[in-house]
């Protein structure tokens, strides 16, 4: 099955549509000689031009803004390439989620599943609103400037200030890059926390199924079959977690490496250089976007770890005492397997955990003081 045919995954429909528009789905299926490749070249062509213009401006605000945009654009390019290489695994993600959803039964499980779906929709809308606000504040207000200006401080091989045709060409070039990079950034940054929250809730649903075994009017054989089905659900849940790790691990490593630098640059400019109200609003919104990039990811990564830890105790919440010897044998196997700690690592190195989020802010403070000392603003 082609990835472009799997958009019926309701939980990630918006993210997959964003990847489809940006050409990621075509590239992941091997269609390199297509419009998608040309679009990606056009979208990321500003990256070396931004790199060429770093610290080439007289205004320190533009210099630091250019540095932040360059770091962000480079990280977006790296994350985009990593996702393209792994996006075909979304087909298996769809299958595993469908398998687990089909096991939802009973009023308590149905209510929890319904709440999970509603929360996923709210999270997705929050990301959409955040990135839409960042785009509007970043890409639109240049029209209110008294002089000709561009949304991004960037090096161009031609003089766009003295030619209206060159200016319009540079403006369209930058706006296209802004639109598609923010769209790619939205998909890449919103998918990991959404899927981690979904895994955490699927684990909680499995806990409910296991803990309810033996308290109804079913026979011993039926209770044993329910436990065997829960073991199959456990296998599917572990597989879903493994596939998710392979999808988000390295892109999140890039994000953790970049987040501290961007926070430091944003706060540095906001505290020492920004004077106008608009600039303050822009950098505050940019800081909000950076926070939304990472905090939900670390929070739901912590939730996943805690949910899998609770799975071990759910085994003994069932009415196992009155069950058959065969049931208790299966129960012991299930209990032993749940002892394995499920640790999410970005790049197989950094935990996707709230402690890492705190460490990112500590790293941002260190980089902030380094920048302040460099410019003689630390005292």
Swiss-Prot record:
Signal peptide: none annotated. The keyword Ribonucleoprotein does not apply. One of its GO terms (biological process) is sensory perception of smell. It is a multi-pass membrane protein. Keywords: Cell membrane, Glycoprotein, Membrane, Olfaction, Receptor, Sensory transduction, Transducer, Transmembrane, Transmembrane helix. Expressed in 10-40 sensory cells in the third antenna segment and in the maxillary palp. Glycans are attached at residue 64. Residues 58-64, 147-162, 275-280, 362-379 are extracellular. It comes from the Eukaryota. The keyword Cell membrane applies. This is Odorant receptor 23a. It comes from Drosophila melanogaster. The gene is Or23a.
